[in-house]
Amino acid sequence: MVTPTPSRLVMAHTGELTGEELGAVRALMDAAFDDFTEDDWSHGLGGMHALVVTGDEVLAHGSVVMRRVLVAGRSWRCGYVEAVATAPTRRGKGHASMVMAALEGLAPAYDLMALSTSPAGQSFYGSRGWQPWRGPSSVMTPHGTEPTPDEDGAILVLAHDLDLDAPITCDWRDGDVW
């Protein structure tokens, strides 16, 4: 009888991951999402990664990168969650919950934790205490602030005492700004 290799959680900064490890994470993203772009990949780099691995297989991943968001006239240090995925054949086993618990543990390092999700992810994140931002969203572009109405309702924040009905503005980046 073959004993399955137990899964384990690995936390590492992007700079601590090998090219092989990053390649495995990228392969996971491509398998999990039909439309994962180079910009999406770039957004998940430069911060802390949580990986659930077994042997040399990456079962699940998520990262937190530092961004700036404007709320109530103040620039907040935001831990922004990116690239959360579980291998399609490994879903439903708690791997994404392991990843999120590790990433949520980084909250004390930031003023605010946020993410943007699809409708399919709303219940998962909501069950973990993430709340929808109810106010209008926008992005600070090189040409000024522009509304991002397609993101309204998709932006979630980890339980925080901010006014969730206030306008929220993120910093500029290529690809999906939220």
Regions found by a protein language model. Give the residues of each.
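Conserved active-site tyrosine of GNAT-family acetyltransferases
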Residues: 125, 130
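Conserved N-terminal entry element of GNAT/NAT acetyltransferase domains
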Residues: 1-19, 169-175
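Conserved GNAT acetyl-CoA-binding A-motif
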Residues: 105-118
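Conserved catalytic-core motifs of GNAT/GCN5-like acyltransferases
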Residues: 131-157
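A structured, mid-to-C-terminal "fold-capping" secondary-structure block
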Residues: 149-178
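Short glycine/proline-centered loop/turn elements that form peptide/ligand docking sites
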Residues: 96-100, 120, 138-144
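Conserved acetyl-CoA-binding loop-helix of GNAT-fold acetyltransferases
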Residues: 81, 86, 92-105
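A conserved beta-strand-loop-helix scaffold within acyl/acetyltransferase catalytic domains
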Residues: 11-85
